[in-house]
Design a protein with these regions (language model features):
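CRL adaptor-proximal regions
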Residues: 1-44, 52
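Internal amphipathic alpha-helical repeat/solenoid segments
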Residues: 25, 36-38, 116-119, 148-175
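Short hydrophobic alpha-helical "box" of cullin-RING ligase substrate receptors
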Residues: 41, 45-59, 64, 68-76
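Conserved short beta-strand element of beta-propeller blades
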Residues: 42-44, 83-102, 132-141, 164-188, ...
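Beta-propeller domains
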Residues: 100-159, 191-206
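Beta-propeller blade signature
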Residues: 107-117, 198-207, 246-259, 312-323, ...
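Beta-propeller fold detector
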Residues: 121-127, 211-217, 262-268, 326-330, ...
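Blade-level signature of beta-propeller repeat domains, shared across WD40, Kelch, NHL, RCC1
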Residues: 409-471
Length: 471
């Protein structure tokens, strides 16, 4: 018995001779080699879980997170993260503002994160060259940022139809349009050496870079864009004809899934066809002055133009179900508030259509469209918007986080973003207890309607346009 116990006790355990230690070391070596060859996003965690963690990060942190490792950069710039953020309901809305620098007239983009109240400057848009409406990248000294030049508006361009084409010839680029689809920004067309371009550029916020994509079928400048059913629609604008600039009634649609442009039926401009004489038909130019996606359709207000006058002639509605245009209700089209001659801004918030109407040099009105009564109603009678005669867009509207936002520039070159929680028409019943909406009839309460959410001085820069991206 004693011999048995002695024999049993004489057996050395693995840890006594270092066998387990060597085995442990070899395992660690094999695992480290495996991790080196196939590094995980987060050590010791499956990549599926790591991706869930990255997806829940605030977007503002992705720029720095991409520098952690190559695998993190690949994950953050991949489409799977975008899909996962949307699936988890953690995608965020950011406001992207396009500005024009006063010193060199270049376009610059700035993104605003309303959650962290931080700003991010986007990389400069790539260099381009022009040849017959087509674009090529990489020509030194020629940048997409030159597309809009000081003092050039749609009204200036249309004067070219009346024998003043040299105005466009003196400006290298102007008149690009912007839009959004599938979580990316798009810059479309514009002029190059008095020729309308077909080119389209896309900014991917995950990759943080610009890329040229499929060109439009027609060269356009000052066209209107809108998003509907995950497709980017483009209508109107001007192009080059046999006798100079020609207004366009055509439209086309871009599918980001296929990268293909498809033609859409032309707008009819029926009011143009009803003109009594051929002289008036030649003198008055049909212009699409805006476009917005509203109630599952595209709404395009229109005007007839003869320098220096614009005449509102209602508008048309595109129905994607029937693939056809129909006349816009009279009250909607003829009463659509105008920002300035040739341009009508609007924003849709929680299914309601809003527009800003400048009433005096330093005041404006916010109006909401009532589809039941086919009329525009004032919701705020005093909006502090400045009068900048040389500015293309002294103020902008945007629907962000379910609220209406007003972007304005003050005399000190400070860009202010103002937000309103709730707007009711002036003739609506008083809001229920606990609601924050103010009655626009009470002047002392007007200032309480708007809340300043951000301000930043961008030196001498003009507002051009804005878009909202949710990713």
């Amino acid at each position: 018995m004693g011999a048995f116990l002695s024999s049993a006790n004489s057996r050395k355990h693995p840890w006594e001779n270092g066998e387990a230690l060597r085995t442990d070391s070899s395992k660690k070596l094999r695992m480290s080699v495996s991790l080196y060859e196939h590094p995980r996003l987060i050590p010791w965690l499956p990549d599926e879980i790591s991706l869930q963690i990255l997806a829940r990060m605030p977007r503002i942190g992705y720029l720095k997170a991409k520098m952690v490792s190559r695998s993190w950069k690949a994950a953050i710039t991949g489409s799977e993260l975008y899909r996962l953020r949307k699936e988890l309901g953690v995608d965020e809305e950011w406001l992207y503002i396009l500005m024009k620098k006063a010193d060199d007239q270049k376009l610059v983009w700035h993104a605003f994160d309303p959650v962290s109240s931080q700003w991010q400057r986007l990389p400069l848009m790539p260099g381009i060259s022009h040849g017959g409406g087509e674009c090529k990248r990489g020509v030194p000294g020629l940048r997409l940022g030159d597309l809009v030049s000081a003092g050039i508006r749609i009204s200036d361009v249309i004067r070219g139809w009346l024998g003043q084409k040299d105005l466009i010839d003196r400006i290298p680029f102007c008149g690009c349009a912007i839009g959004t689809v599938a979580g990316c920004l798009y810059v479309l067309g514009g002029f190059s050496r008095a020729s309308a371009m077909k080119c389209v550029w896309r900014y991917d916020p995950f990759v943080n870079s610009w890329q040229e994509v499929s060109s439009m079928s027609t060269g356009r400048a000052f066209c209107k864009t809108s998003l509907l059913n995950n497709k980017l629609f483009v209508v109107g604008g001007v192009s080059n004809g046999k006798n100079g600039l020609t207004p366009l009634q055509s439209a086309e649609m871009y599918d980001p899934a296929t990268g293909v442009w498809t033609e859409v039926p032309d707008m009819t401009f029926s009011k143009m066809q009803a003109l009594p004489t051929a002289f008036l038909a030649e003198l008055l130019k049909p212009i699409a002055t805006g476009m917005t996606s509203y109630r599952g359709k595209l709404y395009v207000p229109q005007s007839l133009y003869s320098w220096p006058f614009f005449v509102d002639v209602g508008g048309e509605i595109f129905d994607p179900e029937t693939n056809s245009w129909e006349q816009m209700p009279a009250g909607m089209g003829e009463g659509w508030p105008a920002r300035q001659a040739g341009t009508k801004l609007s924003a849709v918030v929680d299914g309601d259509l809003y527009a800003l109407e400048p009433s005096t040099s330093d005041r404006g009105k916010i109006k909401i469209y009532d589809p039941q009564e086919d009329t525009w109603k004032v919701t705020v009678s005093q909006v502090p918007v400045g009068d900048f005669a040389e500015s293309e867009s002294p103020y902008l509207l945007a629907g962000l986080l379910g609220k209406l936002h007003l972007i304005i520039k003050d005399v000190d070159n400070t860009i202010n973003i103002m937000q309103t929680d709730c707007l009711k028409p002036m003739d609506s019943p008083a809001p229920a207890a606990g609601m924050t909406c103010q009655n626009p009839d009470v002047s002392e309460q007007e200032t309480d309607v708007w809340k300043a959410v951000a301000s930043k001085n961008f030196a001498a820069a003009e507002l051009v346009s804005c878009q909202v991206l949710r990713i």
